[in-house]
């Protein structure tokens, strides 16, 4: 019962993140699309389930899950081809899902078809969910990630004399240092500080990718002992999103690596969002970002395909110490 953890080939859990991301997004979208297509087949007699097309997309996805594509240990042109497959098939699945949704709406007079909505995880103190708040939420803003709900309030961005930037939306307060790291993140509902003393969220580190054997397959524990921080990092500017949010733009550079990060706090949101673009021209290196959290817990859960695995946070045994790398799909 549980995970069979092999103390080998740990790099395949995180190598080529774009392969993991594309695979998980397409898996999730396939499930949603098949559900909508099945529902359309039930509600609209004229709708024809696109079985052959979905089967073809499934076969391509399963091919890209094969060794060495999904593990990230293939050569470059293989990943380019897989990336193109993900982009093409995800776009097509969205079209199929939209067609199925429109078919359901046309067959049911009571169907309320919305094209400008998004699911916002939210539960009020009285137990009301996002469904009860749909009318109040209104349209969505897609300027950053498509899930910014309309709100009367705005995020207040304040630049201090010492270069620090404070983002405050009444629910969260983030203090961002001139180097772009988040030095404080406070939940204003309970006053809890989420960043440990003396640390910061969003500090990038380069590690040596020189395993004893099998490049792109393994990561040695020694690599973490030689981590080099990217110290040439600074805040470039602060901008406002379309719906009253605030974004801090951070630039980080070192030999062969350029990182552009956007840190966004939106109105009525309890999430501080990071969106990062990396121009990678380095070799025999890999990149990590440090996200320390002041949370008391013994274990952490990480999503994998169709489930999750747990990892010990405290390294009390040799077995715990060996689990220093983990698959992390969406959380």
Language-model region placement:
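Structured mid-domain segments that build the active-site/substrate or prosthetic-cofactor binding neighborhood
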Residues: 1-48, 264, 273-277
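Catalytic and substrate-binding regions of extracellular carbohydrate-active enzymes
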Residues: 10, 16, 27, 51-55, ...
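Polar, glycine-rich mid-to-C-terminal structural blocks
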Residues: 324-331
